[in-house]
Amino acid sequence: MILTALSSAIALLVPIIILGAAWVLASRSTEDREKSSPFECGFDPKSTARIPFSTRFFLLAIIFIVFDIEIVLLMPLPTILHTSDVFTTVTTSVLFLMILLIGLIHEWKEGSLDWSS
């Protein structure tokens, strides 16, 4: 009981201390024109520092990450099948795969997976 309370207290205090230190250290830097401008050998920059980014590519990357995380969640499934109730595990897995399939069909119908347009 005491060990659990001590672990919980440490788990709460360490992030608070780190965030506090980051806040104190970050407040020391002051914003001015020279610090926020890109450095090009002392001359004024030739173009903006911002590069245009394709929102189509960004959306496709986010979809990939979401489906990749869902696949990673399916990885322990064979181990779970051997250790727990088979009916519950299969039912949960089929429900999870159906939600995945519905999401994929929605993205397909929406046109998010079409790279050419």
UniProtKB/Swiss-Prot annotation:
It comes from the Eukaryota. The chain crosses the membrane at residues 5-25, 57-77, 86-106. It is a multi-pass membrane protein. Its EC number is 7.1.1.2. InterPro entries: NADH_UbQ/plastoQ_OxRdtase_su3, NDAH_ubi_oxred_su3_sf. One of its GO terms (cellular component) is NADH dehydrogenase complex. It is found in: Mitochondrion membrane. It holds the Pfam family Oxidored_q4. Keywords: Electron transport, Membrane, Mitochondrion, NAD, Respiratory chain, Translocase, Transmembrane, Transmembrane helix, Transport, Ubiquinone. The keyword Methyltransferase does not apply. GO terms for molecular function: NADH dehydrogenase (ubiquinone) activity. It catalyses: a ubiquinone + NADH + 5 H(+)(in) = a ubiquinol + NAD(+) + 4 H(+)(out). Belongs to the complex I subunit 3 family. Core subunit of the mitochondrial membrane respiratory chain NADH dehydrogenase (Complex I) that is believed to belong to the minimal assembly required for catalysis. Complex I functions in the transfer of electrons from NADH to the respiratory chain. The immediate electron acceptor for the enzyme is believed to be ubiquinone. PANTHER family: NADH-UBIQUINONE OXIDOREDUCTASE CHAIN 3. This is NADH-ubiquinone oxidoreductase chain 3. It comes from Lumbricus terrestris (Common earthworm).
